[in-house]
């Protein structure tokens, strides 16, 4: 629980990049699932000894949650879920870094729903994230797992929409949410204008916490929201990448947290994901992309480009070449972005061309092919991009088109950063059984 020491959090310098924190009570879980701490302070929060559950039933969740989990087809928890849920459902603060596709969202959704005792008109859970699409997706996960909890109401708030609609929803006792999923800027505005009461919040979650807290303006918004909540609450933070520099900042919000680092930082690439590169000239990319789309078997594919202009032009070319495609980027109207995201998620299109707006956190189950038409500028972004394929430990295929010296350098950094060997795409192609789930 986070309570004492909140003043220290709220007074730290915004330009402080490294903070020395006494965090000896926290526990780190290494990639092999064994406890990394020395085992002392066994009665304190974070002193976790390995529990390897064979099924979600072992977590002793509410019957309503168990039914929803069965409906979703989940039988066995992932590694991060095994390590985290047994403690998080009892209110333990959590700092969790685990690779994409391991079900981090389900950890905090199930944990907060398990603890939720809905009171009409009271917000009990706040979830913050950095992207509107991600907020929308998290809201949908809450709806999916709370389907047998009819009294639970969830709402999503983000910028670019009419604030009056948010206020109307909040002031109506019939629609006022118990769970709020939001981007920091919009929620801060609602708090500032006294349009939302956070004095009853029991769970405070930050998803993609590194992105949320590394930007000073967004971090200030989070602090203002944090001040509006009670001192006695659970705080949980999650991300696929969590640098050594950002961890002390995260810990300022936490008290004696359970720290879960599933797989060490050098091995964050996904199990089951086949990764290849193709070396070619820039002018050869369109022909090679068409060949790949013709030759490869896939359910849905996401193609990453480096700019809005290239996204629009490539989508036009694909549609003209009889490859029905949809594009999503950050420069379109908010309503249009959400509509296109929904259309792709609901399988109305099999091909999506996107900038990095879809490169972090977005979860669409049918994607099993990711193509870097343009290489990312940094190694971490590669992880988030290719993580769209092979979600939840399933198979997938990632192909990167390498056309410049800069691309070669990024490819080398990716292999060094994640301790992975990315091989050249075979001329004869690849066996579909290596990247398709049977």
From Swiss-Prot:
Keywords: ATP-binding, Helicase, Hydrolase, mRNA processing, mRNA splicing, mRNA transport, Nucleotide-binding, Nucleus, RNA-binding, Spliceosome, Transport. GO terms for biological process: mRNA export from nucleus; mRNA splicing, via spliceosome. ATP binds at residues 98-105. Residues 272-433 form the Helicase C-terminal domain. A motif (DECD box) lies at residues 207-210. PANTHER family: ATP-DEPENDENT RNA HELICASE DBP3 (PTHR47958). This is ATP-dependent RNA helicase SUB2. It comes from Eremothecium gossypii (strain ATCC 10895 / CBS 109.51 / FGSC 9923 / NRRL Y-1056) (Yeast). The gene is SUB2.
């Amino acid at each position: 629980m986070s309570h004492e020491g909140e003043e220290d959090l709220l007074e730290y310098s915004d330009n402080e990049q490294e903070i020395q924190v006494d965090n000896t009570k926290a526990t780190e879980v290494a990639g092999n699932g064994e406890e990394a701490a020395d085992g002392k302070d066994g009665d304190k929060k974070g002193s976790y000894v390995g529990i390897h559950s064979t099924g979600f039933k072992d977590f002793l969740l509410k019957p309503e949650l168990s039914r929803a989990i069965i409906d979703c087809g989940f039988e066995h928890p992932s590694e991060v879920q095994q390590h985290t849920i047994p403690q998080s459902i009892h209110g333990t603060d959590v700092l969790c870094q685990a690779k994409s596709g391991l079900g981090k969202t389900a950890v905090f959704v199930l944990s907060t729903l398990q603890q939720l005792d809905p009171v009409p008109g009271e917000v009990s859970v706040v979830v913050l994230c950095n992207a509107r699409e991600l907020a929308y997706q998290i809201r949908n996960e809450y709806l999916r797992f709370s389907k047998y909890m009819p009294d639970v109401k969830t709402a999503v708030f983000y910028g670019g929409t009419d604030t009056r609609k948010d206020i109307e929803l909040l002031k109506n006792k019939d629609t006022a949410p118990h769970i709020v999923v939001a981007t920091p800027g919009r929620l801060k505005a609602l708090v500032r204008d006294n349009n939302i009461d956070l004095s009853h919040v029991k769970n405070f979650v930050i998803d993609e916490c590194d992105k949320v807290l590394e930007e000073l303006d967004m971090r200030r918004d989070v602090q203002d929201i944090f001040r509006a909540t009670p001192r006695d609450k659970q705080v949980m933070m999650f991300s696929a990448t969590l640098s050594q520099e950002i961890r002390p900042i995260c810990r300022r919000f936490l008290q004696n947290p359970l720290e879960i680092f599933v797989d060490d930082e050098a091995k964050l690439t996904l199990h089951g994901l086949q990764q290849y590169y193709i070396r070619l000239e820039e002018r050869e990319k369109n022909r090679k992309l068409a060949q790949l789309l013709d030759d490869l078997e896939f359910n849905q594919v996401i193609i990453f480009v480096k700019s809005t202009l290239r996204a629009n032009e490539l989508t036009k070319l694909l549609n003209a070449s009889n490859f029905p495609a949809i594009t999503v980027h950050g420069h379109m109207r908010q309503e249009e972005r959400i509509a296109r995201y929904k259309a792709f998620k609901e399988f109305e299109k099999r091909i999506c061309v996107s900038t990095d707006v879809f490169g972090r956190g977005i979860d669409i189950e049918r994607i099993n092919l990711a193509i870097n038409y343009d290489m990312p500028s940094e190694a971490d972004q590669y992880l988030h991009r290719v993580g769209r394929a092979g979600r939840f430990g399933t198979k997938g295929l990632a192909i990167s088109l390498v056309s410049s010296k800069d691309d070669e350098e990024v490819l080398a950094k990716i292999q060094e950063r994640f301790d992975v060997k990315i091989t050249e795409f075979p001329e004869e192609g690849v066996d579909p059984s290596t990247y398709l789930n049977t």
